[in-house]
Amino acid sequence: MLIPRKVKHRKQHHPKRSGVAKGGTRVVFGEYGIQALEPAYVTNRQIESARIAMTRHIRRGGKVWITIFPDRPLTKKPAETRMGSGKGSPEWWVANVKPGRVMFELAGVPEPVAREALRRAMHKLPMKCRFVRREVEVS
């Protein structure tokens, strides 16, 4: 699972989910990628599940890059607890993903295989996504 090694503050405010991604909106490392179309919190378990779905489909052929990291703790109070007495304990780690953000990248496989592998990964994620190709710069 992906979690930070060390954090300055154990509990944080919830990040805003509004707006669009400022950076990380293009495929940089690989040839193909998954781009978010909606805002969402993606947990470390969802990231790992998507990674496994992709790597099992491409087998030994390609290379996978994960371009998001779950660096935000989300807290939760125990069930049937009265309100008050402080913020709950950290329950899971999330990455705050905004629309336009490329989350996974893939290279070294033919396009039909990449499209199917990324489609399987999209089913593991909590938002609508789309398949994107690397843009070729003409100079």
From Swiss-Prot:
Binds 23S rRNA and is also seen to make contacts with the A and possibly P site tRNAs. Gene3D superfamilies: Ribosomal protein L10e/L16. This is Large ribosomal subunit protein uL16. Residues 1-19 have a biased composition (Basic residues). One of its GO terms (biological process) is translation. GO terms for cellular component: cytosolic large ribosomal subunit. Residues 1-22 are annotated as: Disordered. Part of the 50S ribosomal subunit. Pfam families: Ribosomal_L16 (PF00252). InterPro entries: Ribosomal_uL16 (IPR047873), Ribosomal_uL16_bact-type (IPR000114), Ribosomal_uL16_CS (IPR020798), Ribosomal_uL16_dom (IPR016180), Ribosomal_uL16_sf (IPR036920). Belongs to the universal ribosomal protein uL16 family. GO terms for molecular function: rRNA binding; structural constituent of ribosome; tRNA binding. Keywords: Ribonucleoprotein, Ribosomal protein, RNA-binding, rRNA-binding, tRNA-binding.
